[in-house]
Design a protein with these regions (language model features):
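General structural signal for secondary-structure boundaries
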Residues: 13, 55, 166-167, 199
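Acidic/His- and Gly-rich active-site-bordering loop/insert found
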Residues: 1-118, 135-139
Length: 199
């Protein structure tokens, strides 16, 4: 699935954004224990630390059995914002017209397992926050980036993170969780254009 939406403001960075998502896809972060390979998860974590140095320099990183929590201090510690999107994926199924793990970029589209569900949104979160930090932006409130490594199998990393936040008195003002793609053509069973925001 893809969208033809463009914003000229971001065109100069489009190659970087596509490269980021492509590299995300190349990491076979399959959480199903039958196909699980820890080295692929380690590769993903190593990449984001190199790719987004300011996020990790300015943020406090905690590992929850592969689950990612990064807290970036804002001017206020009250009413933080949480941005969420998981980075694990399911095994490739069915027939693919290309390698599901290639992260192939062609005609402005990045192909592969996880592009929509949901490495695309996670890449957007990291790229946006890194860009803001690079510009010297100061967040009004604390920001948490949270990403599950076990969402597809209903794992314990996010429940553990929720408990950690609760135990430390953190009460988010807003949680934006993955949502879905902005896709054109529409998903099966939906007439017209389609977008979903998870809040």
């Amino acid at each position: 699935m893809m969208s033809e939406y463009t914003d000229e403001k971001f065109v100069p960075e489009k190659n970087r954004y596509a490269e980021t998502l492509s590299e995300f896809i190349k990491c076979k972060t399959i959480s199903d224990e039958r196909f699980f390979d820890k080295t692929e998860f380690d590769k993903f974590l190593s990449f984001i630390k190199r790719r987004f140095p300011l996020v990790f320099e300015k943020g406090e990183y905690k590992d929850f059995n592969g689950g990612i929590m990064i807290k970036i201090d804002g001017k206020s510690h009250d009413e933080p914002l949480v941005l969420m999107s998981h980075y694990d994926v399911v095994q490739e199924n069915g027939k693919w017209s290309f390698d599901a793990w290639s992260g192939k970029v062609e005609n402005g589209v990045v192909y592969g397992r996880g592009a929509v569900d949901t490495k695309g949104s996670l890449a957007a979160i990291f790229e946006s926050v890194e860009s803001l930090l690079n510009e010297g932006f100061a967040f009004s409130n604390d920001l948490y980036i949270i990403s599950s490594s076990r969402e597809e199998i209903a794992g314990t990393d996010v429940p553990d993170m929720v408990k950690y936040l609760a135990d430390n008195g953190v009460k988010p003002k807003l949680v934006i969780d993955e949502g879905g793609g902005i896709v054109d053509p529409p998903v099966p069973g939906v007439s017209g254009k389609y977008a979903m925001i998870g809040m």
